[in-house]
């Protein structure tokens, strides 16, 4: 009986301890996710669990767009609506993209999965049949799956930037015959097979128009693989650390090339300009901040924009071709483009010279022969395009021929572009098409008069207008990639004059002689005029809705382009950024904390967090935090420890300095909470002591209760007579 009661008490106590342990474990699990970005919309209550718990309350049909970014998902939910057309699963923990997941979404058009951990791709030849855009940037892909056979894929845009791809195997993209935009930038790509861009049947990848190889380890552009891109219009080779030369017949099979960007490639020392003879449609060349010493001329039929600033050019009158015929060649930032005289040179160049003054120096040297410019044919014309703000303006100029009233109207195409970086991949398809019209409306562009063009009796005027130049054949997919050229912090101002020209409206001739500039007329289409009016509207003097402390804030430069608003002054990318302002920390636990900061007024490409425990020497850091982030968690901290944390901004010029005081303080100190494990074992110990005390007390009480009582028996008193006194013995009962 006694042992049975003790066993029952022990079982009861063990059950109490197990229940307490489970409750503490649930509390600990609830603390693991420090923060969660929820979907704004009808499903705000669905983020209670990271994966299939999202299915609770999710509509089975009718949903076309779903955002699951920043949900810590390790796999996509199995209950996604079949009507989805756009799915954003970026910034999660996805490890694979498989055919069953894509097969359940037959209407999917846009799939965004950048910044995950995807290392494996599994799909069949018909899996991506309806998909139009796929973004797999900044994942862990080391290779792409081979194409199983002919595919009906309609994929037009594929982004693979930031993946550890080392090589492209033959027919890597054969499954995507409709592919138009391919981004392979910032990868470890060092080799491209000759048939990498070949189709399943060995033919070319005929639809590709834009290829971005910026930031890769390629040493040269080879004709073997580029010949399979006959419709290539834009080629980006920015920030190529190993690209040394451009030569050979690499552009022999790409006659449609319009834009070549090799900017910020320090190893590029030689460009054989003869290769551009095979690109009659070339309009933009960017070689800024390379290592070129010369840049020879070639025959070009297009208006050409060239950027050469930041190169160690050697002064030579051969470079004057860039400035002689301003109707055909626009040198971007000519005043900032410098040349140095050759060592031991005895020519007219005595020191560093801006290319904007090169023509004057060469003209004064009688022994120098310049390229023919034939300026007399353009008397009284105001024509040279002006670089203002972020773009090369599209302008129209009136040329009054001596001795006649015929009007020549020339349209200089606008060329607005950028180089792709972390998250932004922009492109604009410049148009070649123009329409004839009898409309006599004339738009003047600010310019510098050609030599000999100014008349003694004429006043010259300069106005400007920005015009869109989107081809009617261009699709929204191509035309949406748009961003301006880099501009100088102090753009040079061109001479502005006034000119009054009287001309009698006549029928405009569109077939001029061979030695004159082609006459291109403004289209009298109402839609183009409406678009032109919208684009030409003056910028509003309002500040952009830019909050430097907002997490995932859209960069102000993009807001400025989108809404024509005013951004705060930012230091350039070549200047070390100012330190961020650390707002503080939140959600402090025993092993983690969430750090908040505000962006500086500088160009920032990424952030870093450095932290160290008080009294310890080892400094820990978190690097490559994306530029739009304003908060980041720190994990695996020591409980009950004081830490010193600093947030640093970084760009190509370097890291910002740590600042521990002042209003722009980038460092702070915090202390983690005591360990939950210690608290748990403390509670267990207290519970154990309470249990032992209870058991001891129970045993004592039980023993006291069941202790037998003392029994009293009858006692007979016997008295004996003392023999000495001879008394009688008396007995009592």
Curated annotation (Swiss-Prot):
Specify the protein name.
Answer: Leucine-rich repeat neuronal protein 4
Which regions span the lipid bilayer?
A: 677-697
Q: Read off the CDD domains from this record.
A: FN3
LRR repeats span: 62-82, 83-106, 107-128, 130-151, 154-175, 178-199, 207-230, 231-253, 256-278, 281-302
What subcellular compartments does it reside in? Membrane
Where are the stretches annotated Disordered? 395-423, 480-518
Its main subcellular localisation, reduced to a broad class, is membrane
Q: Which Gene3D superfamilies match?
A: Immunoglobulins, Ribonuclease Inhibitor
Its function? May play an important role in hippocampus-dependent long-lasting memory.
**Which species does this protein come from?**
Mus musculus (Mouse)
> What InterPro entries does the database record attribute to this sequence?
FN3_dom, FN3_sf, Ig-like_fold, Leu-rich_rpt, Leu-rich_rpt_typical-subtyp, LRR_dom_sf
At which residues is glycosylation annotated? 70, 183, 291, 299, 327, 408, 469, 619
User: Please, one GO biological process term?
Assistant: long-term memory
